[in-house]
Amino acid sequence: MANIPLLQCIQLTKYYQRANFLIKVLNCITLSIQSNEMIAVVGASGSGKSTLLHLLGGLDKPTEGEIFFEGHALHKLTDNERSVIRNKRLGFVYQFHHLLSDFDVLENVAMPLLIGGIAFNQAKSRAQCVLELVGLKNHINSFPHELSGGESQRVTVARAIVNNPSLILADEPTGNLDQKNSDSIFQLLKKLNTYYGTTFLIATHDLDFAKKCHKILMISNGKIKLSQNDSFR
């Protein structure tokens, strides 16, 4: 029997009303993502990469089409219902880390757990374990302004995985990093994928980064083309 997809969209369409005309960003996209996959999403600026991630992550609703995540029909859920799923089963990493400046690294990473109602000591213990996993055990009491760009992005990754999500959606996670830090972040994501089974969908302009993923999803003119990367490394 075929594996049930972790995430699936069927005939997904998204357009925006602008004055007297419509801007169609995504047009009848059908896509299935299996557990443990690491997929890069590439395309020109404005092609719809971020829009696709927002829809698949339940941050926005499609104009038409269906989205299923772990058996949940996201397109049918209320905003509050989608919010609960996002906090418990999804992780997000962005180009800009959006760390809370008044909180230290440990508190920033623990925040999703605290929002989810986890006890303070349990949340901090889990956050500390995750920070050790991403190589930041010596920075748990540091504040965001004391971190380098690469360290800040590692904190963002730690915050994204602290709830042990089955899927992480990353939007240009290395966009503000130099090549050395970009390579370091990729190796971190690959480790999480290989050893912990985390599934990744990563929007990127970096074709070298994309070529290191299992599959590459190209968006152009609102359509997608998915290719297998046989040289995954």
Curated annotation (Swiss-Prot):
The organism's taxonomic lineage, starting at the top: Bacteria, Pseudomonadati, Pseudomonadota, Gammaproteobacteria, Enterobacterales
Domain ABC transporter: 7-233
Quaternary structure, from the entry: The complex is composed of two ATP-binding proteins (LolD) and two transmembrane proteins (LolC and LolE).
Membrane topology note: Peripheral membrane protein
InterPro entries according to UniProt: AAA+_ATPase, ABC_transporter-like_ATP-bd, ABC_transporter-like_CS, LolD_lipo_ATP-bd, MacB-like_ATP-bd, P-loop_NTPase
Stored Gene3D superfamilies: P-loop containing nucleotide triphosphate hydrolases (3.40.50.300)
Gene this protein is translated from: lolD
Biological process annotations from GO: lipoprotein localization to membrane
SUPFAM superfamilies on file: P-loop containing nucleoside triphosphate hydrolases (SSF52540)
Functional description taken from the UniProt entry: Part of the ABC transporter complex LolCDE involved in the translocation of mature outer membrane-directed lipoproteins, from the inner membrane to the periplasmic chaperone, LolA. Responsible for the formation of the LolA-lipoprotein complex in an ATP-dependent manner.
Protein origin, superkingdom: Bacteria
Gene Ontology CC, one term: plasma membrane
Membrane-spanning parts: none
Stated name of the protein: Lipoprotein-releasing system ATP-binding protein LolD
Matching Pfam families: ABC_tran (PF00005)
UniProt organism field: Blochmanniella pennsylvanica (strain BPEN)
Cell compartment(s), UniProt: Cell inner membrane
Keyword Ligase among UniProt keywords: no
Ligand binding (ATP): G43, A44, S45, G46, S47, G48, K49, S50
Enzyme class, spelled out: translocase
GO terms assigned for molecular function: ATP binding; ATP hydrolysis activity
Key words of the record: ATP-binding, Cell inner membrane, Cell membrane, Membrane, Nucleotide-binding, Translocase, Transport
Known EC number: 7.6.2.-
Family: Belongs to the ABC transporter superfamily. Lipoprotein translocase (TC 3.A.1.125) family.
